[in-house]
Design a protein with these regions (language model features):
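Short alpha-helical segment of the dimerization/phosphotransfer core of two-component systems
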Residues: 97-102
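A conserved beta-strand-to-alpha-helix junction within the catalytic ATP-binding
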Residues: 123-138
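Conserved glycine-rich
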Residues: 183, 248-253
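Short alpha-helical Gxxx[C/S/T] motif in the catalytic ATP-binding
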Residues: 236, 240
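Short conserved segment of the HATPase_c
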Residues: 207-221
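Short beta-strand/loop element within the Bergerat-fold HATPase_c
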Residues: 184-194
C-alpha cells in the first residue's frame, strides 16, 4: 500500500507558474522598453544639441559679413563719396566681398540638400590630380601659418573626376586639419593597386573614438559648446564623403592621441 503526499507549496507553484512566467515576461518587456526609451531620449537630446549648435553657428557666420556690410554702408553715408573716391571704392569692394561670402554660404547649404539625391550631376573629365592638389596646398600655405607638406609617387592623370567637387572635397579635409589639428600637416598621394590613395595627416590631439564615426554625419560637429573661433556648419566632411562615394571611392578616418589621418581611395578609371 502506497501513500502519496502532495506538497501544497509545489502544487501552488505549478498552478501559478504561468502567471510567474507572464510576470517575468512583462517585467522584461518593461525594462527593455525603458532602455529603448532612454536611448531615444538621449538621441533626441543629441539632435537638439546639434540643431542648436548649427543654428548658433549659422547665425554667427551670417552676422559677421552682414555687420561688415552695414558698417561700410554707414561709412559711405557719413562722408562725401564724390570727393573721396578711393575710400568709396574701398568700402564698395569690402561690401562686394562680404556679399560674395554670403552667397557662397547660402550655396553651400543649398548644395548639401542635393547630395543625397540624383540631382547632383558630376562633370567628369581627365584630371592631373597632383597638379590640382598642389594648387590647393599652395593656397592654404598662404592662408595659414601651419606647416603643410605635399608628397606624391604618381605620374598619371585620373580619367574620370569632377574637378570642382573633388577639389572642394580635398580642400575640406585640409581645412579641417588646419582648424582642428596640430602644426604639421602632410598631404600624400600614392598609387596602390588600381586606386589612387590620398591621405591628409596632422599631429593634433586626435578625435575620440565615440566621435570618429559621426564626424561624417550631416551638420555634426564635435560637441565643445559654441565654438565660434572655428568656422563652419558641420557639413564639410559630410560633403567630402558623399562626393568621394559618388566617384566610386571611399573615405576613412583613423585617429589616435597625437595623429589624425583622413584617407581617400579613388579608383583609377
Amino acid at each position: 500500500m502506497r501513500i502519496y503526499y502532495n506538497d501544497p507549496t509545489l502544487e501552488a507553484l505549478k498552478k501559478s507558474s504561468t502567471g510567474i512566467l507572464l510576470s517575468l515576461l512583462l517585467c522584461t518587456t518593461v525594462i527593455v522598453s525603458l532602455f529603448y526609451l532612454l536611448k531615444i531620449i538621449r538621441k533626441q537630446k543629441e539632435l537638439a544639441e546639434i540643431k542648436n549648435d548649427l543654428i548658433s553657428n549659422i547665425t554667427h557666420e551670417f552676422k559677421t559679413p552682414i555687420a561688415t556690410i552695414s558698417t561700410a554702408v554707414e561709412a559711405i553715408e557719413n562722408f562725401n563719396v564724390l570727393e573721396d573716391t578711393e575710400k568709396t571704392k574701398r568700402y564698395l569692394l569690402m561690401s562686394s566681398a562680404q556679399l560674395k561670402k554670403l552667397h557662397q554660404m547660402v550655396e553651400k547649404l543649398l548644395e548639401t540638400a542635393t547630395l543625397d539625391s540624383e540631382k547632383l550631376i558630376l562633370k567628369k573629365e581627365s584630371v592631373d590630380l597632383v597638379g590640382l592638389i598642389s594648387r590647393i596646398v599652395k593656397k592654404y600655405k598662404i592662408l595659414t601659418e601651419k606647416n603643410i607638406s605635399l608628397s606624391s609617387n604618381i605620374h598619371y592623370r585620373i580619367q574620370s573626376l569632377d574637378i570642382f567637387h573633388v577639389e572642394n572635397a580635398i580642400s575640406n579635409l585640409i581645412d579641417n586639419a588646419i582648424k582642428y589639428g596640430g602644426q604639421q600637416i602632410e598631404v600624400n598621394i600614392n598609387s596602390v593597386l588600381n586606386y589612387t590613395v590620398i591621405t591628409v595627416v596632422d599631429d593634433g590631439k586626435g578625435i575620440e573614438k565615440n566621435q570618429q564615426e559621426r564626424v561624417f554625419d550631416k551638420f555634426y560637429r564635435i560637441p565643445k559648446g559654441n565654438r565660434h573661433d572655428v568656422k563652419g556648419f558641420g557639413i564639410g566632411l559630410y560633403y567630402s564623403k558623399k562626393i568621394i562615394e559618388k566617384h566610386g571611392g571611399t573615405i576613412q578616418l583613423t585617429s589616435q592621441t597625437d595623429t589624425t589621418i583622413f584617407k581617400i581611395n579613388l579608383p583609377n578609371e
